[in-house]
């Protein structure tokens, strides 16, 4: 347990920031799942619109240091590729 007041404050801040980061990461995963769901359903237009939203959320995650840039680029690339290969 922290003894100094500054260490106690840092511990409190860590708890708050962890919750916010988990919430943001969960939101990113949810939007990616929506895109994958639309791809599996075969709705190309719906998948494209969901991809635009997912790209935005993924890049916001990069900006907030939730995920790394290369990871975000890979996710967006894979989703885009799946949509392009749809009939």
Swiss-Prot record:
One of its GO terms (cellular component) is small ribosomal subunit. The keyword Hydrolase does not apply. It comes from the Bacteria. One of its GO terms (biological process) is translation. SUPFAM superfamilies: Ribosomal protein S20. GO terms for molecular function: small ribosomal subunit rRNA binding; structural constituent of ribosome. Keywords: Ribonucleoprotein, Ribosomal protein, RNA-binding, rRNA-binding. Pfam families: Ribosomal_S20p. PANTHER family: 30S RIBOSOMAL PROTEIN S20 (PTHR33398), SMALL RIBOSOMAL SUBUNIT PROTEIN BS20C (PTHR33398:SF1). Binds directly to 16S ribosomal RNA. Belongs to the bacterial ribosomal protein bS20 family. This is Small ribosomal subunit protein bS20. It comes from Rickettsia bellii (strain OSU 85-389).
């Amino acid at each position: 347990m922290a003894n100094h007041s500054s260490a106690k404050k840092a511990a409190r801040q860590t708890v708050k920031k962890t919750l916010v980061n988990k919430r943001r990461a969960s939101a990113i995963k949810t939007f990616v799942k929506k895109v994958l769901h639309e791809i599996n359903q075969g709705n190309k237009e719906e998948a494209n619109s969901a991809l635009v939203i997912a790209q935005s959320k993924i890049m916001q995650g990069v900006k907030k240091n939730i995920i790394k840039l290369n990871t975000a680029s890979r996710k967006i690339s894979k989703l885009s590729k799946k949509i392009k290969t749809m009939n």
